[in-house]
Amino acid sequence: MKTILSALGLSLLIFTSCGGQKKVEVDFIQDNIDNAVAQNTIQTDIIEKSGKILNPRTINKDGSISYIPIDDWCSGFFPGSMWLTYNLTGDQKWLPLAEKYTEALDSVKHLKWHHDVGFMIGCSYLNGYRMADKKEYKDVIIETAKSLSTRFRPNAGAVSYTHLRAHETL
């Protein structure tokens, strides 16, 4: 009888301890979403006040923000974060921002000298296509894939990763 009561008590302890873990996970996830929203809000406020379309990459040692051109391999990450913020929060204020920063990358679809166009267009246009049903983004995605395919080397069976200048060819 003592063994049965001990087993029952242990089972009860295990089952009750499992319930709190879910709340901790939910809080952890929500805290991270809230943090991302706060960071994106600060960044978009700064950019929108500038009157320019800027693409942040990192914070410099002096605390200033480093912005990048659209042909930088990280250029799709900021628009992608706008799409993720829109998707995670459902807040409509993020939709026009996601569209604006995504559509600023339109010319990336023609980059044939860059092997990272998948990051650039996947994070931006592809997220818009799948998260907001932006069917018009499909043409940009396909054109980008065609540009990237010009880097395919049949003998190697791979896409060339060598960066070329705009005037050079593979």
Task: Give a label for each model feature.
Residues 71-86, 113-130, 165:
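Well-ordered alpha-helical segments within folded domains of soluble proteins
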Residues 163-170:
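Single conserved hydrophobic/aromatic residue that forms the stacking wall/gate
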Residues 101-104:
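Flexible, solvent-exposed coil segments and beta strand-coil junctions
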Residues 131-136:
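Short coil/turn connectors between adjacent alpha-helices in alpha-solenoid helical repeat scaffolds
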